[in-house]
Amino acid sequence: MSIQVHDTLTAQKRELVPLEPGKLRLYVCGPTVYDYSHLGHARCYVVWDVVVRHLRARGLEVRFVRNFTDVDDKIIQRANERGEDPIALASRFADAFHEDMDALGNLRPDVEPRVSGHIPEIVALIARLVERGFAYAPGNGDVYYAVRKFPEYGRLSKRNLDDLIAGARVEPGEAKRDPLDFALWKAAKPGEPAWDSPWGKGRPGWHIECSAMTQKHLGAPIDLHAGGKDLVFPHHTNEIAQSVAATSDGLHAEDFARYWMHNGFVQIDDEKMSKSLGNFFTIRDVLARFDGEALRFFLLGTHYRRDFNFSDQVLAEAERRLSALYETVEKAERLGAGVEPGAEPAFVERARAALDDDFNTPQVLGIVAEAFTEANALADRKGKKSPEEKARLAAFARGARAVGAVLGILGRPPAQALSAIRDRAAARRGIDGSEVERLIAERAAARAAKDFARSDAIRDGLLARGVVLMDGPQGTTWKVE
């Protein structure tokens, strides 16, 4: 087994070799919790959830840490607007974030540190940087990192200091020695949360927070650091500078994290998602209209490094495809019940290999689609199934569930999943499910009375509204086209 990942630091695909055999330490930058999470968060955290699932399925003991930033300028601004305590506001939105992640089927990290609970570690790390000459306190209560002291600054983002200096500036009130320098500690201001430090009361800057929490919960160096590609600069670039300067004499980026991975942006109908364009969607906006697993399935259809394009139409198509997968699993499990499954189907190992190759989820979904087509053909073949055919269907169902477990899909009983997906689709079309059930009962009575004209009229009337009836051994079910 060889797992290949695209490493942002080297801009190459590399074999993922943990520092300690059999164990992997992963840090993913979590959300700044000042509002409900948006589609960009959904895309990001589904990606890293699949990474964790696959690494564990491949036998690695993964320690997964993802933080909450609950001390930040945006949180303070939002809290002041609402007259709310900043930490309380952040806690409320952190709870909402958990609800959204649960709806998407994401596993919880092993550790979820919060900035507000790590102030002593942050202060100690800043003091270490001052002691080693990489940071300075100008005397106004702030502390800054001296960017030019770190020789590999910009290596991750492929930017040199000459390029950066053109866009750098000193804000009014800042006491930077160099426009490139960034804040590690900010002096207290009225109405803001503040903590004691050797430089006076204040609060941490954004970048130092993740460095401190990574070191506290994973040590240094770690194996893998991940997040959205918008974090490459300045956040991850600054994390490297801080963490390496505090812990290593070699001053190489690898002394903090051996591998860096980043996921692409979310676009809405081929435009960048933004509030100013009026195309900004929270996860809750989407989950009010679509099933959470359908959204997850949709997100997996684009390779994690590529930008992801969202549209209702394509999500609805993904929802239809997911329903078809569940229908096939239902048939395979029903027809293969009571027999010993046959050998593991070849598609399972092909799916593993695709995930080993930089977590190629679109390729996995293509492999799964081929396998499901074959299973459908076998399940729908007329006549009684032989013991061998039943064993093949049972093996397919077990393999489908195994691949689904790594992707975080196909984990529900088919009837439950199909009903949930159908009900969301019906609601979007203005279809009343209780009315459909009433008409199904009326149609059953008409058929029992041999009133086939009435039976056909009900079926055709529902079909005209996008409702397809399916008659089976257990009765009539329905779905929305």
From Swiss-Prot:
InterPro entries: Cys-tRNA-ligase, Cys-tRNA-synt_Ia_DALR, Cys-tRNA/MSH_ligase, CysS_C, Rossmann-like_a/b/a_fold, tRNA-synt_1_cat_dom, tRNAsynth_Ia_anticodon-bd. Pfam families: CysS_C, DALR_2, tRNA-synt_1e. Its main location: cytoplasm. It is an enzyme of class 6 (ligase). Its EC number is 6.1.1.16. Belongs to the class-I aminoacyl-tRNA synthetase family. One of its GO terms (molecular function) is zinc ion binding. PANTHER family: CYSTEINE--TRNA LIGASE, CYTOPLASMIC, CYSTEINYL-TRNA SYNTHETASE. Monomer. A motif ('KMSKS' region) lies at residues 272-276. Binds 1 zinc ion per subunit. It catalyses: tRNA(Cys) + L-cysteine + ATP = L-cysteinyl-tRNA(Cys) + AMP + diphosphate. NCBIfam families: cysS. The keyword Oxidoreductase does not apply. Its cofactor is Zn(2+). This is Cysteine--tRNA ligase. GO terms for biological process: cysteinyl-tRNA aminoacylation. Keywords: Aminoacyl-tRNA synthetase, ATP-binding, Cytoplasm, Ligase, Metal-binding, Nucleotide-binding, Protein biosynthesis, Zinc. GO terms for cellular component: cytosol. ATP binds at K275.
